[in-house]
Amino acid sequence: MGLKNINFFPTDHMKQNLAYMHERAPDGKLSIRPAGHLLRKPLTAKTPEEIKSTFNAGGAGCFAKPAEYAQIIATLLNDGVHAKSGNRILKKETVDQMFTNQIPEFPDFGRQGIDPPKLDLSNPLPELYPQGDLPQGWGLTFFLHQHPGPTGRSGTTGWWAGLPNLFWWADREQGLGGIIASQIVPFGDGAVMGLWGTVEAGLYQALQR
């Protein structure tokens, strides 16, 4: 895929362009987070021993340039083929399986909220993606819808989020996906989530023109 800026251990070049971690106070003001980045060890690990002793979580911990992360989303939309290079990264059946609900017997699993949270890391969220009492699903790697969302996304859309208020989605049915990326805690920031909804809804509206 030719991606240069995605890594669990940022290169020196990536560190030079690293966005500062911010936090929003209860009064709405933003400031640089005094404790620094949420993941300090990958940023400071240099020796083979330090790197080996660093835990890389499967669902979090990747540093990336949003434009390059978007190419991964586009590859999922294109049934596993990286459109820019024409290289097949995943088999279509693998992508199909990723977007198949693996836990139909647990329709409420995905809606488990964050309450009470650690207030320096997350706002209270009763649900991650409120849809009333409609069943929701979970693929091999992300939250899966079973019904259309209010922005226009299809009922087969996959999506997930990162703690510093990063939100991505991939709607294979309509061939549309994207990412909203910030470096702001706590999670569930109203301004960022509002921007996410506005941008996503605008894209779907543009498709209908």
How would you label these PLM feature ranges?
Residues 168, 177-180:
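Short hydrophobic-aromatic micro-motifs
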Residues 151-158:
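Short, hydrophobic/aromatic-rich segments at coil-to-beta transitions
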